[in-house]
Amino acid sequence: MDSSDPSTTTDDTGCPYGLGRMAATARVTMTEVAVLARHLLLYPTGVFQESPAPAAASVPRQRTAPPRTAPPTGPSGPAHTPLTGPVPTPVPVADLPPGNGPVGADGQLPVLLLHGFVDNRSVFTPLRRNLRRHGWRQVSALNYSPLTSDVRHAAALLGRHVEELCERTGSARIDLVGHSLGGLIGRYYAQRLGGDVRVRTLVTLATPHAGTRAVPFADPHPVVRQMRPRSALMAELALPAPGCRTRFVAFWSDADPIMTPTESARLDHPDLIIENVGVQGVGHLAMAVNAQVVAGVRQALRSVSDASEAVDAA
């Protein structure tokens, strides 16, 4: 019998490859539907930005971050100026009560969570609770406007949030976790706006680092066009980034239908400190709530590279 016949070729479990793929796709789809249903129930709780809790008296005075250097000029115009000097009227960040104490005893930095496209901070409700249970005392999430039309502008706004968070917590550096578009915004801030002096580790979940070709009917939205593989934004992020001090941990899944191809959620750049973490059978929405991924996020936030430790000690 011809072993190349798809009907006779089996996987490790003895199931024909075609049937195995169909079953796996069905499982991922059912999980995505369940995650979406739960998220729709939580979505109203994250519509509004929460005001930050007052800083605790025990929070030490903020350490001064190293001076920032201007990022290189982009392919389509002058470089975007990094945020320096006093920050005008900081926009409040959303705290997970009662997360207004000093940094955890294990040395965890404050964590700031960035949601994805057409979403809000409620997507991180399970992750925030999980981090709190495991000792993180400063876990915040922010909402950027659903009308955001430029990743660069959103990254500049993120910079203002980060400065306010550092001032309030007394920490010179923080960690970021971004889902989908949120990871791209965090990357632009750290890589192009000098945010690496503030961001020790950026964890991205299902972020289109190489761009994605999925959902072609959404191209009229300018942010979607920026997430296409050959966009000016992708070209800018591919430019040299010598000396970038942020450590990047990129989680990607072989079953993410929004990442086309799925490997586009991997991060590859010769100048960046990168760890790519592949997971199997996890859909796009589930990447923010999957137990395996959440455990991986905790591990990534606890594991600090030598380069990051050197910067913190500076």
Label the predicted regions:
Residues 111-122, 128-245, 251, 258, ...:
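Serine-dependent carboxylesterase/thioesterase catalytic core
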Residues 254-257, 279-281:
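Glycine-rich beta-alpha junction loops
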Residues 1-111, 125, 134, 309-314:
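Flexible, membrane-associating and regulatory peripheral segments of lipid-active enzymes
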Residues 137-138, 270-287, 297:
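Catalytic histidine neighborhood in serine/cysteine hydrolases
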Residues 107-109, 242-248, 271-275:
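Short, proline-enriched alpha-helix->beta-strand connector loops that line the catalytic pocket
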